[in-house]
């Protein structure tokens, strides 16, 4: 227990400290031809221009143009050129004409009638399954299955009543 106490205290101090206030400057380094990010500056590193973490927007971040790296002796004096592709963000064109909408009551009524039809079909199917379970061959009556089927039939009946009430309000 004593050995875990310092670890717990360190974790609590990390959790309670605001990370945004302690954010360090980030540097980009090119080491052996690979880009590495670090918080410790060195000779081959330069400051990066990264967007802040947690900044949400609908626009994409466009990388700034970086200076070309100096030729390194490891690649035979040839300069490796890398330019980040610059992408322009275009906003979608907005249509001035609103879409044609059908009358709300007619479409709602047709949806409710379709749902009522589906519920009636589901009710007859649930009633068939319940009657088959009650007439089980060999005397093996599964009471849990019968209770679940009865609950299903009751749910369907209540759904039908609710749909009929809703249609009656129109």
From Swiss-Prot:
GO terms for biological process: DNA import into cell involved in transformation; establishment of competence for transformation; type IV pilus assembly. Residues 109-166 form a coiled coil. Residues 87-107 are annotated as: Disordered. It comes from the Bacteria. GO terms for cellular component: periplasmic space. Required for stabilizing type IV pilus (T4p) in extended, nonretracted conformation on the bacterial cell surface. This is Type IV pilus assembly protein C. The lineage of its organism: Bacteria, Pseudomonadati, Pseudomonadota, Betaproteobacteria, Neisseriales.
């Amino acid at each position: 227990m004593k050995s875990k106490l310092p670890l717990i205290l360190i974790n609590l101090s990390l959790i309670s400290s605001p990370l945004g206030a302690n954010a360090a400057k980030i540097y980009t380094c090119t080491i052996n031809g690979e880009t590495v990010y670090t918080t410790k500056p060195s000779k081959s590193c330069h400051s990066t221009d990264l967007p802040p973490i947690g900044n949400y927007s609908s626009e994409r971040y466009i990388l700034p143009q970086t200076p070309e790296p100096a030729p390194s002796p490891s690649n035979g004096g040839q300069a490796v050129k890398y330019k980040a592709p610059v992408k322009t963000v275009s906003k979608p064109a907005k249509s001035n004409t609103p879409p044609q909408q059908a009358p709300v009551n007619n479409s709602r009524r047709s949806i409710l009638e379709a749902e009522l039809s589906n519920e009636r079909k589901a009710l007859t199917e649930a009633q068939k399954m319940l009657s088959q379970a009650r007439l089980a061959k060999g005397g093996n009556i599964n009471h849990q299955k019968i209770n679940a089927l009865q609950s299903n039939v009751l749910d369907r009946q209540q759904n039908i009543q609710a749909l009929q009430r809703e249609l009656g309000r129109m």
